[in-house]
Amino acid sequence: MGRIIGIDLGTTNSCVAVLDGDKPRVLENAEGERTTASVIAYTEGETLVGQPAKRQAVTNPQNTLYAIKRLIGRRFEDEEVQRDIEIMPFNIVKADNGDAWVEAQGQKMAAPQVSAEVLKKMKKTAEDFLGEEVTGAVVTVPAYFNDAQRQATKDAGRIAGLDVKRIINEPTAAALAYGLDKQGGDRTIAVYDLGGGTFDISIIEIDEVEGEKTFEVLSTNGDTHLGGEDFDNRMINYLVDEFKKEQGIDLKADPLAMQRVKEAAEKAKIELSSTTQTDVNLPYVTADATGPKHMNIKVTRAKLESLVEDLVQRSLEPLKVALADADLSVGEITDVILVGGQTRMPMVQAKVTEFFGKEPRKDVNPDEAVAMGAAVQGGVLAGEVKDVLLLDVTPLSFGIETMGGVMTKLIEKNTTIPTKADQVFSTAEDNQSAVTIHVLQGERKQATYNKSLGQFNLEGIQPAPRGMPQVEVTFDLDADGILNVSAKDKATGKEQKITIQASGGLSEEEIEAMVQEAEANKEADKKFEELVTARNQADQMIHGTKKQVEEAGEALPADEKAKIEAAIEALESVKSGDDKEAIDAKVQELMQAAQKLMEIAQQKAQAEQAGADAGEQPKQDDDVVDAEFEEVKEDKK
C-alpha cells in the first residue's frame, strides 16, 4: 500500500500532513505556508486556491468562494443556507436534486466539486514533498457531520483524485496527534474544537497496555452552526453599523466594500487575541455624491468580547451533555486540548479553563493538530504505525419508524463504529405483501421530529395474519460513519438494501436542533411514548376481540355481542386521540365487556383439548415489534 496522507479540510483553513519516520509532519504549500486558506477563486481560464485566491477577492467577490464546508452535503432549503445566501457575496443556487450549489463565472457547481480544489492543492503539496504520486488520504470532518456530509466529503476526495481511505472526526484526530508520544499511563482528555464553521467536543480515553495505545471516544457533542465565521460576522455587522452611523451609508449594498470589511474584521479579530485595541482603517471604502468615504474605527478587546459573549457561552452547553453521556465528572478529565483557530481568543480560553477547572494544554497547535492526527491514522491504515487502536463513535442515533409514528432506534448515539445492529419487525395488517422501511436519524421518540434519511420497499412477503411475518432489518454503520440498511423476509429470504444518499442528508442546523430539542423535551417524549403504547394496545385489543367474536359465532349470546360491539365502538372513537387516560379507560371497559368471550374460548379449548393439535398457530416471537409499514399495492400507511 502507498503512502496515506492526512488532510484537515477546514471551513476557513486546511492543512496536510504525512508521517515522516514515526512522527507526523505538517507540510508547507507552494506559498511557504503550513496552512492553506479554504478559498477558491475562478478567473478567466484559471482556478486559484489559498492565498492567491484570497488576495484577489476584493476585485472578484462574486467568483471567490469561501466557507464552502458550510454547504457540503446540504439542501438549498435549509434555513442556515438561506441565511448564508444573505451574507455571501457569491451566488448560492438550488441544484436539480435540491442540494445547495454555488455559481461562479456563470457555471453552477456542487459543493464537493469546489472543495475538491482545496483537496487537489493538499494532494499536490504532499506529492511535491514526497516526490511520488499520492492517491490515499484520511480526511477529517466535524464530529457532528451527518451521513450526507460525510458522503459528500468522500465525493470531494474522489473528484480530487484521492481514494479516501477513512473519514475521521476532527477532535479524535487531534487526540491521536496529542496522545501518540505521551507517556505516563491512562488519560481522559477533553478536546474542545472551535473551528471556522463548527464546534465539537469529544471526551476521549487513552489507555496503554503493554505498549499498545487505545484511543476510545466515550462521547461527542457539538453545535454545527458555531465557528469563527460567526465571530467574524458579528465584527462585520458592528463595523458596518458604526460606519452607517457616522456616514449614513449602508455598505451591505456594495459587494466590493463588504469584501474589504470582511478581511479587515477577520484581521482585527485575530489582532485582538494579542492586543487590547486595534484600528480598522479602510481608506476609500466607498463614495457618494460628496466624495470618497474612509472607515476608521477603533475596536477594543472588551467590545469584541461583548459582541460574541453569547457565542462563547453557547459552546459550554454541549460540554455538559458530553460529560453526562460519558458518565464522567469535570474532575475526572486529566487533560484539556484546544483545537481550531478560534480557540486562540483569550475569552474562549478563559471560559474553557473556568468550566474544567484547569488550564488547557499549551503543547498543541490548534491549526495543525487535526491534520497531524489524520496522518497518524493514515500510518495505522498503511501499516506504518503499530500498537495504535482508534475507536470512534457515531454522534446521532439511527432507527426506523414503527407503529404509531415512533422512532425505534437500532444504533444509539455514541456507539463505537464500525457497528452492525439488527432487529425483527412484523406487519401491521393481515395479508400484507410488502413493507416500507423508513430510515431516520436523530434523538426524538416521535418519528416526525427526526430527519428522514430515506425509505425503500421490501416486496413479496407471503400473506399471513398481522404480526406473523418476520422482517429482519439490519443497520450497518461503517468506520466512516456512513450507513447501509437492508431488510430481509425471514420466510422467503427476499432481501432489499439501500445506501443512504447524500442528497437525503441532514442539515447542520437540524442536527444541532435534534440533540438540543431531545434534551429539552425528554418529558414530552416520555408522554408521547406512553400515548403510542396505549394506542397500540387499543388496536391489538380491538383486532383480537373482533376475531374472537367471529370465532365464537352463535355461542355468543346476542346481548353480549351487542355489549362488546358497543365497547369496541367506544374504544375506536378515542384511540386516535391524545388522551391516554381515556384510551386506557375504554380498553378496560372492552376487557370487562369481553369476559363472556373468554369463558367461551376456554370452554372451546377444553373441548378440543387445546395444545394437542399439531396444526396449532405458531407462537409469535416475543422479540417481534409491531411496525407501521406501507402496503405498497393498497397504499396503506
From Swiss-Prot:
InterPro entries: ATPase_NBD (IPR043129), Chaperone_DnaK (IPR012725), Heat_shock_70_CS (IPR018181), HSP70_C_sf (IPR029048), HSP70_peptide-bd_sf (IPR029047), Hsp_70_fam (IPR013126). Keywords: ATP-binding, Chaperone, Nucleotide-binding, Phosphoprotein, Stress response. This is Chaperone protein DnaK. Residues 623-637 have a biased composition (Acidic residues). Induction: By stress conditions e.g. heat shock. The keyword Cell cycle does not apply. The gene is dnaK. Belongs to the heat shock protein 70 family. Residues 601-615 have a biased composition (Low complexity). Residues 601-637 are annotated as: Disordered. The keyword Transferase does not apply. Gene3D superfamilies: 1.20.1270.10, 3.30.420.40, Actin, Chain A, domain 4, Substrate Binding Domain Of DNAk, Chain A, domain 1. It comes from Vibrio atlanticus (strain LGP32) (Vibrio splendidus (strain Mel32)). The modification Phosphothreonine is found at T198. GO terms for molecular function: ATP binding; ATP-dependent protein folding chaperone; unfolded protein binding. Acts as a chaperone. SUPFAM superfamilies: Actin-like ATPase domain (SSF53067), Heat shock protein 70kD (HSP70), C-terminal subdomain (SSF100934), Heat shock protein 70kD (HSP70), peptide-binding domain (SSF100920).
